[in-house]
Swiss-Prot record:
Protein name: Ras-related protein RabG2
Species in which this protein is naturally found: Dictyostelium discoideum (Social amoeba)
Biological process per Gene Ontology, one example term: vesicle-mediated transport
Pfam families linked: Ras (PF00071)
Membrane topology: Lipid-anchor
Gene this chain is encoded by: rabG2
Amino acid sequence: MSDPDVFKILLIGDSAVGKTSLLLRFADNSFQETSVNMTSVDYKNKNIVIDGRTFNLQIWDTAGQERFRTITSSFYRGAHGVLVCYDVTDQLTYNNVRLWMQEIQRYAVLGVSRVLVGNKCDLEDRKLVNTSIAREYADSLGIPFMEASAATGVNVEEAFMAMANEIYRNHMGGSKPSVVNPGSGGTSNTGGKKKFC
């Protein structure tokens, strides 16, 4: 049996939006209440199946580099997709999404797949970022959008599956494939609307 194709995915966004928590929830189904330090772990792997083919998602975290604006073109090298993350309880992190999108344009390959993810949607009473405005922005870019919660797990797997589907469609010639979600044994089609917190 041959090794699976590798999709390199980057997690970017302002510091403390929960990028590492999203990664750990998806890759390990774990969540830590306290801040997670990724300086010792740069990436995690998880295998998924799309249209009967196994793919390895190699998901890279910025490991705190975003605090110092030291993310360089080398971080983006070879990336197939980028999850741009913000915190729904922090308007500034959403405002900075445009800067992150500009950075993707500057450093990533043309046509890299992107997904916009608003994290911490479980904190309804503290929510500041309007869902419809974020959705309109994502629609204007022609990219998937969803709100997720690393704490509860809501839409975390869906966000990474949306990314995998985008990469598959853009780089492998697929078209809205059915995905066997890891751990669920079932399939889902990412073409439908996502539920929000």
